[in-house]
Amino acid sequence: MAEAKQVLDVTDIQKILPHRYPLLLLDRIIEFKRKERIVAIKNVTINEQFFQGHFPGYPIMPGVLIVEAIAQAGGALLLTEIPDQNEKLMVFAGIEKAKFRKPVVPGDQVRLEVDVIVWRNTAAKLMGKAFVGDKLACEATVSCQIVPRPAKPENS
């Protein structure tokens, strides 16, 4: 991937991340700076599965899924830098200082800005922020680990 601003669509994202519906939470990557920063977009619609129960009559995107979207953006950044990326997964190792400032609701477009704080071998700490327009909706520091991807069962 290039250093300059670059757009990756959901098809490109699926080549990097193993997540699929209903847990793929990135629609587009709009900025990518190798080993440093990524900016991704999540378009939130009323059709999201989680709105069925969170909350009926007042749909709000669960905060934990906003943090997951931050982690997925970070995963897209990190996994592109390692050899054999299709044989690896990025998993949570910790969440620190998660703060939720504004509800995310159907119709919102969430801009996920993720910066690398530290990255050593297979472990990283990332600072992520989720914005709706110019309003900060969520911020969190996430720690993650790159691990081998388990082999797929033969019948899958």
UniProtKB/Swiss-Prot annotation:
Organism domain of life: Bacteria
Keyword Lyase listed? The answer is: yes
Name the InterPro entries for this protein.
FabA_FabZ, FabZ, HotDog_dom_sf
Active-site positions on this chain? 54
Q: What is its EC number?
A: 4.2.1.59
| Record's catalysed reaction(s) | a (3R)-hydroxyacyl-[ACP] = a (2E)-enoyl-[ACP] + H2O
Q: Which UniProt keywords apply?
A: Cytoplasm, Lipid A biosynthesis, Lipid biosynthesis, Lipid metabolism, Lyase
Subcellular compartments: Cytoplasm
The processes (GO biological process) annotated in the record are: fatty acid biosynthetic process; lipid A biosynthetic process
Q: What's a GO cellular component annotated to this UniProt protein?
A: membrane
Indicate the enzyme's highest-level EC class: lyase
One MF annotation (Gene Ontology) recorded for this entry: (3R)-hydroxyacyl-[acyl-carrier-protein] dehydratase activity
- Which family is this protein grouped under? Belongs to the thioester dehydratase family. FabZ subfamily.
User: What this chain does, per the record?
Assistant: Involved in unsaturated fatty acids biosynthesis. Catalyzes the dehydration of short chain beta-hydroxyacyl-ACPs and long chain saturated and unsaturated beta-hydroxyacyl-ACPs.
Under what name is this protein listed?
A: 3-hydroxyacyl-[acyl-carrier-protein] dehydratase FabZ
Q: Which organism is it from?
A: Koribacter versatilis (strain Ellin345)
Q: Which gene encodes it?
A: fabZ
